[in-house]
């Protein structure tokens, strides 16, 4: 694992492309999945072929606000969910990759993404996308895994250290106080205006006394069931990977994922990007995703892939 850690660059006005993306029309919705209300946003024409975007640990649907409109501009229906325990979705007593994969498929249907959908996941979301491919493969058009760490055996000690970085449920006396404590895990330099946007959507009032807390369930790791086993046969959809040059997915990990999923899975590297590629090199990420989706839309799947 490697990460780029720098001081934040000086604040500057958000560029036109970013403000235009945030102003793009979006539908907000929710669907019940196994007793939990799962929220999502959607862009582009309902009923069109499209994509479900899956965030990483402690993140939420709004991490994609400046990415999704670019994909929708290509005529796609694009939905971004907040998985249970994240964003404005409900918390659960227990969490699992299997449950999150069910939420992804439920949102694809509720948001009217025409079947079969593409699934794109960042970090933890890439793990969810991979499991969804193993479980529902022939019902998917393909998955893109963005800078997801792929380990053999138990997670290494540095992953446990990262988990501790998500905190323990502390509250703060004001919105300003909690926003001042917003941190990325792992820390890295990102675009200040993107950071400010996602931070603003990461907090909420916690009680009538005026305390503020994070939207994600900070007991998430304690409530996680054992990880899903890897697939025992090749997945039945196409697979691509996007790696950040200074991110968490090494070339060795990319090879490990290819082996697990049983697909050739090209890997595109985003130069100069850290793990949080949505926040530091978003336009390069958009270009990579557009290229993959355009290629898949225009060509037939390989033999052995539905």
Label every model-predicted segment.
Residues 1-51, 73-76, 113, 294-306:
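Alpha/beta-hydrolase fold catalytic core
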Residues 33-39, 73, 79, 83-120, ...:
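Active-site loop/oxyanion-hole signature of alpha/beta-hydrolase fold enzymes
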Residues 41-88:
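Conserved HGGG/HGGXW glycine-rich cap/lid loop of the alpha/beta-hydrolase fold
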Residues 205-260, 269:
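Conserved serine/cysteine hydrolase catalytic core
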């Amino acid at each position: 694992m490697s990460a780029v850690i720098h001081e934040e660059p000086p604040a500057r006005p958000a560029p036109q492309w970013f403000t235009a993306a945030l102003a793009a029309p979006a539908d907000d919705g929710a669907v019940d999945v196994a007793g939990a209300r799962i929220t999502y946003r959607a862009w582009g024409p309902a009923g069109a072929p499209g994509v479900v975007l899956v965030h990483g640990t402690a993140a939420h649907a709004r991490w994609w606000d400046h990415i999704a409109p670019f994909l929708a501009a290509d005529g796609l229906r694009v939905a971004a969910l907040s998985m249970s325990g994240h964003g404005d979705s409900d918390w659960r007593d227990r969490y699992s990759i299997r449950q999150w994969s069910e939420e992804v498929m439920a949102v694809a249907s509720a948001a009217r993404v025409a079947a079969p959908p593409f699934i794109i996941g960042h970090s933890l979301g890439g793990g969810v996308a991979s499991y969804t491919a193993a479980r529902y493969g022939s019902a998917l058009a393909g998955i893109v895994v963005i800078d997801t760490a792929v380990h053999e055996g138990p997670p290494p000690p540095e992953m446990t250290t990262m988990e501790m970085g998500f905190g323990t449920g502390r509250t703060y006396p004001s919105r300003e106080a909690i926003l001042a404590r917003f941190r990325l895990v792992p820390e890295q330099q990102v675009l200040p205006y993107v950071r400010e946007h996602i931070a603003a959507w990461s907090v909420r009032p916690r009680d009538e006394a005026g305390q503020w807390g994070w939207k994600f369930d900070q007991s998430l790791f304690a409530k996680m069931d054992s990880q899903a086993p890897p697939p025992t046969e090749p997945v039945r959809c196409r697979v691509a990977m996007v790696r950040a040059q200074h991110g968490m997915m090494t070339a060795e990990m990319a090879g490990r994922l290819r082996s697990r999923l049983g697909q050739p899975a090209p890997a595109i590297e985003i130069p100069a990007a850290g793990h949080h590629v949505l926040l530091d090199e978003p336009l390069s990420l958009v270009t990579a995703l557009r290229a993959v989706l355009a290629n898949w839309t225009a060509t037939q799947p390989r033999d052995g892939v539905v």
